[in-house]
């Protein structure tokens, strides 16, 4: 049946997305300029933020790059922000973009080693609770030294590998190397239930690992990008940063691990799914088959990948170069020494991360609108106006937490630390209060932001990855599964800010572990970020 040209244009717009979704996006594009010019630019700015969050929430209906990108282009066109401000945001976050382009591709070339290690862990640890704790703890430990995005890229790579192994067998194509694991049409009805259980099992492990990256990432100055900016502004080095965060990070870490155990034991919020026996059998058979067929060429590849993994951890922990550049070195070393020299073989490695890199650039355009329209200014001003120092600490933590749930935590942390630094320089607050506020800002941006995928770049990457539709991980499901962690991490962090931070910091001073900062040390700290 032929289709008219007009209908063809409508059908092509956002492709297979539902009609109601297309109408919603078109409505946003009509409403935004009207609100901006005839109502209030501030209101239009917040409207854009809400609409962008909507596109993220609907990521399984339509990848957010297209609808979010259209909204961002229009925002720039009508003057909500400028191309220069967007470019400034991209330049300020170039390390994150380099990381996505090169590090995620680098991890792709280490897939054999990762599958080898994690298959042993998955088969070796029979208890789901112990396995969940292992994933959460390992992700936390790695995120204290590596970037959370790198850790999540590793976990996603492993999960896709596990999923593909089972799906290939369940579809009756055990030996096929060209099997499409995104298509369920060949899956036997008897195995479909196992497949659903397996998806639930992988979902829970991924969220545990994702929260683990937040638990570990808050502890050190290299754990998250905003930590580096905060440490820089405060003039703290690696060791001092860890000690200053301890009054909050130690109880939060313990309670986070206890939450991991509790949700698995109670089976709430989508947790508790066990590895189906049929799936375990397939993975064990796969592991035995791999072991039997492994040649010296395969062993040589594993050894090379192991050595590259050591270089990766050492290079990142010691900050020998920008994260993305270390990722590029991983690509070069891994391909050179494992014989991957064809361009088309290398192209696959970049498929996963480049759409997300483009999405992140759009995200920074929205951040540029937040800056130019001063959307957060009323909240920041209200918190800084509070006289009581204890209440100010708690309010900073809460305000950071709430804003980090709707915006990028790197941006929120940067804006707040710059405002507090300005207050210190103007003599509004003391150096001691500045140090305590810096701790509140760091923990506030890192802990409550696990509530939604927009707060943590690692969560957003997971939501928009090729894995999410395979294991049916939607925005709403992520928020629901993160809920127990959000409540525990946010409340324990708040408790630590109110009751532990000041007395324990004073105790650390008395013990001589850290020294009180001076205004001079903050003045000499090199300004970073915005």
Curated annotation (Swiss-Prot):
Source organism superkingdom: Bacteria
Primary localization: membrane
Protein name: Na(+)/H(+) antiporter NhaB
Record InterPro entries: Na+/H+_antiporter_NhaB
Family recorded in the similarity comment: Belongs to the NhaB Na(+)/H(+) (TC 2.A.34) antiporter family.
HAMAP family registered for this protein in UniProt: NhaB
Transmembrane spans: 13-33, 34-54, 90-110, 121-141, 145-165, 205-225, 241-261, 306-326, 327-347, 351-371, 455-475, 481-501
Keywords noted in UniProt: Antiport, Cell inner membrane, Cell membrane, Ion transport, Membrane, Sodium, Sodium transport, Transmembrane, Transmembrane helix, Transport
Matching NCBIfam families: NhaB, PRK09547.1
Subcellular location field: Cell inner membrane
Cellular compartments per GO CC: plasma membrane
GO molecular function: sodium:proton antiporter activity
Membrane topology term: Multi-pass membrane protein
Record field: catalytic activity: 2 Na(+)(in) + 3 H(+)(out) = 2 Na(+)(out) + 3 H(+)(in)
A Pfam family per the record: NhaB
Annotated disulfide bonds: none
Chain's role: Na(+)/H(+) antiporter that extrudes sodium in exchange for external protons.
